């Protein structure tokens, strides 16, 4: 069962604080680790990530979108793993994820899975995904291209994240200028794992766009993106 939650964030605004406290409230027996990039206003005791040459870089994407860090949130996950390689599993939640129940109440037996994400992009549906279309023709030849999205509601067992991180570090330049969620899904498939969701309508709770979810505080769940106080 999951004991460790990675809380990815970039500021200490009111919504971040609200959602961080709710995650801790509804999961009192779990460790919640705040994680963020350097040069940001982070929560106390955060794991601070410094980008390194040993990691992929998204300089082209970041310049296109005017943000130095937005497209490479996956680096937070790999870096945290490298500093904490002995946890049994890693459950990732972003700062704009609202919850009103425990992980067990929401995910149930899915927490015993090797990995899951709320939306998956495989060879069956990836061609129309925006971040896939942004790849160069050469990048599209990379084997096992896939995507998981958003970077919240993700589960990785230790062995899974270990293999992904090892493959990434073995050839970081191969993964330059790939959007983080594309890099995550590709690494998962390259390591031999199937992209899976925790349950059939998981995209109604956690998605990349608020208009795609059914946000109902009377129903127990984890919801993303929630960028306002509730």
Regions found by a protein language model. Name each.
Residues 13-26:
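Short, well-formed alpha-helical segments that are part of the catalytic scaffolds
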Residues 98-181:
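Conserved catalytic core of nucleotide-sugar-dependent glycosyltransferases
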Residues 87-96:
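Short beta-strand-to-loop acidic/aromatic patch adjacent to the donor-nucleotide binding site
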Residues 11-16, 96-100:
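Short acidic, S/G/P-rich loop/turn micro-motifs used as interaction or catalytic elements
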Residues 170-230:
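C-terminal catalytic/acceptor-binding lobe
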Residues 1-14:
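N-proximal low-complexity "stem/linker" segments adjacent to membrane-targeting elements
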Residues 2-4, 26-34:
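Short loop->beta transition adjacent to catalytic acidic/histidine clusters or analogous donor-positioning motifs
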Residues 36-86:
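Active-site-proximal specificity loops/subdomain of glycosyltransferases
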């Amino acid at each position: 069962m999951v004991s460790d939650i990675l809380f990815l964030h970039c500021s200490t605004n009111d919504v971040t604080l609200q959602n961080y406290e709710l995650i801790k409230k509804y999961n009192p027996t779990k460790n919640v680790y705040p994680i963020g990039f350097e040069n940001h206003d982070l929560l106390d005791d955060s794991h601070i990530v410094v980008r390194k040459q040993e990691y992929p870089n998204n300089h082209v994407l970041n310049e296109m979108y005017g943000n130095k860090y937005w497209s490479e949130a996956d680096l937070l996950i790999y870096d945290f793993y490298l500093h904490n390689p002995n946890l049994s599993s890693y459950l990732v939640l972003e700062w704009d994820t609202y919850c009103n129940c425990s992980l067990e109440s929401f995910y149930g037996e899915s927490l015993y899975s090797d990995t899951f994400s709320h939306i998956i992009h495989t060879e069956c549906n990836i061609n129309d995904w925006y971040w896939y279309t942004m790849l160069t023709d050469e990048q599209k030849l990379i084997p096992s291209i896939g995507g998981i999205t958003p970077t919240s509601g993700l589960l990785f067992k230790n062995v899974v994240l270990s293999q992904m991180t090892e493959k990434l570090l073995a050839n970081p330049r191969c993964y330059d200028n790939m959007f983080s969620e594309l890099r995550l899904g590709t690494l998962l498939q390259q390591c031999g794992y199937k992209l899976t969701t925790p349950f059939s309508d998981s995209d109604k709770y956690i998605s990349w766009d608020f208009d795609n979810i059914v946000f109902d505080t009377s129903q127990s769940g984890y919801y993303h993106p929630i960028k306002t106080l509730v």
